[in-house]
């Protein structure tokens, strides 16, 4: 977990000051991601990909949706199905 946090922190520094999309993504996703190791990994991969793609904003929004919303939707669906 600590290793992923270090990757996350190091990976963020070169981009954070210059990228509006990353600032939005960081604010939106960090609270959701800090407890989950695989989500640190996903964020580090997102930063890596952002370096190579100019379509960073769209890419980050798509990844952010997958990381944040889909697990929440799955959990809600499970709760609903368990209730019946």
Curated annotation (Swiss-Prot):
Superkingdom classification of source: Bacteria
Impact when changing residue 67 to M: In strain: NCTC 11638
Outcome following mutation: residue 24 to F: In strain: NCTC 11638
Protein name (record): Uncharacterized protein HP_1070
Native organism taxonomy: Bacteria, Pseudomonadati, Campylobacterota, Epsilonproteobacteria, Campylobacterales
């Amino acid at each position: 977990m600590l290793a992923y946090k270090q990757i996350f922190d190091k990976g963020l520094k070169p981009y954070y000051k210059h990228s509006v999309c990353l600032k939005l993504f960081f604010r939106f996703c960090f609270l959701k991601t800090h407890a989950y190791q695989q989500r640190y990994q996903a964020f580090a991969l997102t930063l890596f990909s952002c370096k190579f793609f100019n379509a960073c904003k769209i890419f980050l929004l798509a990844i952010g949706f997958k990381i944040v919303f889909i697990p929440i939707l799955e959990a809600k669906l499970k709760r609903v199905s368990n209730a019946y």
